[in-house]
């Protein structure tokens, strides 16, 4: 795992696990501009249409890399993920030609820690 923090964001590098013909990331996503944000349990104001991590498989590549449930995915391998549909996000994450996925995520606990340190 390689990670760094800046203003509430973290970089997470996931090495996909090969299982036969499939490359496994070990996490699921929810959200997207085509989804109802009021159904997103991670959106604090219920208007955020971002892409969020909804499940992380125990012992899988994502957990090993440090990804957490509730992380908001801002970028995938340099691609902006802030205004994409759920299907566009899924396709970007599961590209067969990419064995490593580099994510830029926002984590609520990181955001709160940064905000509190700025107030101190």
Regions found by a protein language model. Give the residues of each.
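Eukaryotic intrinsically disordered and solvent-exposed regulatory patches
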Residues: 1, 10-15, 37-42, 53, ...
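Intrinsically disordered regions, especially transient/low-confidence alpha-helical propensity segments
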Residues: 1-2, 76
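PDZ-domain C-terminal substructure recognizer with occasional recognition of PDZ-binding tails
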Residues: 2-23, 28-30, 90-120
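Generic preference for well-ordered alpha-helical elements
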Residues: 5-7, 22, 46-50, 67-69, ...
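PDZ/PDZ-like domain segments forming the peptide/carboxylate-binding groove
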Residues: 30-75, 79-82
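PDZ domains, with a preference for the canonical peptide-binding region formed by the helix
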Residues: 68-69, 75-104
């Amino acid at each position: 795992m390689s990670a760094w923090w800046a203003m509430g964001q973290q970089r997470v590098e996931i090495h996909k696990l090969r299982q036969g013909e499939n490359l496994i990331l070990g996490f699921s996503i929810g959200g997207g501009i085509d989804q109802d944000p009021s159904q997103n349990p991670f959106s604090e104001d219920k208007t955020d249409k971002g892409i969020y991590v909804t499940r992380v498989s125990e012992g899988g590549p994502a957990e090993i890399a440090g990804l957490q449930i509730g992380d908001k995915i801002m970028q995938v391998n340099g691609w902006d993920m802030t205004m994409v549909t759920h299907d566009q996000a899924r396709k970007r994450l599961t590209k067969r030609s990419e064995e490593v996925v580099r994510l830029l995520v926002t984590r609520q606990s990181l955001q709160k820690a940064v905000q509190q340190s700025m107030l101190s």
